[in-house]
């Protein structure tokens, strides 16, 4: 008979404690412990469900054979880009995102578009008829895609073993449970053990498994933090529900570059890949407008240009307002302090509002120069000269530092027809400078206005 044990788990990080604690000693969060009843079976859940596996033996690195098909084309160029060129056989991939952002749509498109591959789509949230309706709306046909509405882990593993698919999609990990644990689906212990079982099965059979995870109100993936540690890839699906564009961002990738992004457009027929993000992030105005600047950014290995909008106005109240959309407010406050200290602009009595086009969330320090350029333009109510963009990081002393992969940013600006780009003067002399674009170098932020307003 199984030995029943009660334990308390932190909902934030999965830390286990024998009694309730007000504050988690692992992550430091308050009031996150919940009680769960766990039935301890002989052996781990993963070993019981997935079955016994042959013991591995140490091998020399040179003796290990690489798979002939090291990457699986999932049938979507943007997803392939974020994964580093395709899905690696035997990998466990976690996709997180807000409700309604399009996680299920993207995962179903991947399962249907993987031509030549046998796929199994496991849904714990929808019936087979509902999935069929969504598949018809997407307009993608794949006779090799199997639909399986199920939540019991043991049944799922049995079907995977019977059909031997190349790709399995689990929607979602919070709805899957095992009978070997007494806790409910979505609990810390259930998520941890189900993920560990799927990981063991993926590594032993070479089946790629794509699991969807819900997120909490603070934007992190629900469940124990160990879930993100054990998977090979963590993808974050971002976007504004009021905007048609979505970003797939690689947070963790054992087989490729991290923070690589893929851009999608949400249509009635599903998600469409956007191969050139710069085209949707830039707007061509009939007349020059103040408060608008263009920054050359680079996420992962992909450069793109994005429009930055700023509005600087007199503070109506004693304390000025500072508001941002898609940007870190603390970093904007730092840049405003640099402008006041190093350039002499009286920002302490100004309201400042900042927005990035397309509802994008950016954290690239190489966009500091573009943010400051938009603020300066709005402050003096003077439009930035036509065909000018910026790429550089600003330090607390007002110095302009080179942005990572500046050469790629310059090349992207030249490809899109920009006439001038403002970068750091500390960029090496050996840096490549493409033809057709003037590279203006500055060493400090007080030199920026002259570079922006010169026609």
Whereabouts are the PLM-identified features?
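Peripheral, non-AAA+ core regions of ATP-driven protein-machinery
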Residues: 2-12, 16-83, 88-94, 101-112, ...
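P-loop (Walker A) phosphate-binding loop of NTP-binding proteins
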Residues: 98, 124
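Conserved RecA-like ASCE P-loop NTPase motor core of nucleic-acid helicases/translocases
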Residues: 119-123
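Conserved Rossmann-like nucleotide-cofactor binding loop
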Residues: 127
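Conserved SAM-binding strand-loop segment of SAM-dependent methyltransferases
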Residues: 147-148
């Amino acid at each position: 008979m199984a030995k029943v044990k009660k334990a308390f788990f932190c909902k934030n990080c999965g830390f286990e404690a024998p009694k309730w604690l007000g504050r988690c000693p692992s992550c430091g969060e308050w009031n996150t412990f919940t009680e769960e009843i766990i039935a301890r079976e002989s052996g781990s859940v993963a070993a019981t469900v997935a079955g016994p596996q042959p013991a591995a033996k140490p091998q020399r690195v040179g003796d290990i054979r690489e798979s002939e098909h090291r990457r699986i084309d999932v049938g979507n160029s943007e997803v392939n880009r974020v994964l580093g060129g395709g899905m690696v056989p035997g990998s466990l991939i976690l996709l997180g995102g807000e409700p309604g952002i399009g996680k299920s749509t993207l995962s179903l498109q991947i399962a249907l578009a993987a031509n030549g591959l046998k796929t199994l789509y496991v849904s714990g949230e929808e019936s087979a008829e509902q999935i069929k309706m969504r598949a018809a709306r997407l307009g993608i046909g794949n006779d090799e895609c199997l639909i399986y509405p199920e939540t019991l882990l043991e049944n799922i593993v049995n079907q995977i073993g019977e059909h031997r698919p190349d790709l399995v999609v689990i929607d979602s990990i919070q709805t899957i449970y095992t009978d070997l644990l007494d806790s409910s689906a979505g609990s810390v212990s259930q998520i941890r053990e189900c993920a560990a079982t799927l990981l063991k099965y993926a590594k032993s059979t070479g089946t790629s498994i794509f699991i969807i995870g819900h997120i909490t109100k603070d934007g992190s993936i629900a469940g124990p933090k160990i879930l993100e540690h054990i998977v090979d890839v963590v993808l974050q699906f971002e976007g504004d529900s009021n905007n048609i564009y979505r970003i797939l961002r690689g947070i963790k990738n054992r087989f490729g570059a991290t923070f690589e992004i893929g851009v999608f457009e949400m249509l009635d027929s599903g998600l469409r890949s956007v191969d050139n993000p710069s085209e949707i992030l830039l707007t061509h105005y009939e007349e020059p407008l103040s408060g608008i600047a263009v920054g050359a950014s680079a996420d992962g290995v992909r450069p793109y240009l994005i429009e930055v909008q700023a509005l600087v106005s007199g503070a109506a109240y004693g304390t000025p307002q500072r508001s941002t959309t898609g940007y870190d407010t603390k970093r904007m406050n730092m840049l405003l302090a640099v402008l006041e200290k190093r350039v002499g602009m009286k920002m302490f009595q100004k309201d400042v509002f900042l927005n990035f086009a397309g509802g994008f969330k950016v954290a690239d320090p190489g966009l500091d120069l573009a943010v400051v350029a938009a603020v300066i333009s709005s402050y003096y109510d003077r439009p930035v000269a036509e065909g000018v963009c910026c790429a550089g990081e600003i330090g607390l002393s007002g110095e302009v530092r080179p942005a990572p992969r500046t050469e790629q940013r310059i090349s992207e600006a030249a490809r899109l027809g920009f006439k001038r780009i403002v970068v750091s003067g500390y960029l090496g002399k050996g840096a490549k400078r493409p033809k057709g674009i003037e590279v203006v170098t500055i060493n400090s932020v007080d030199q920026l206005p002259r570079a922006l307003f010169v026609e």
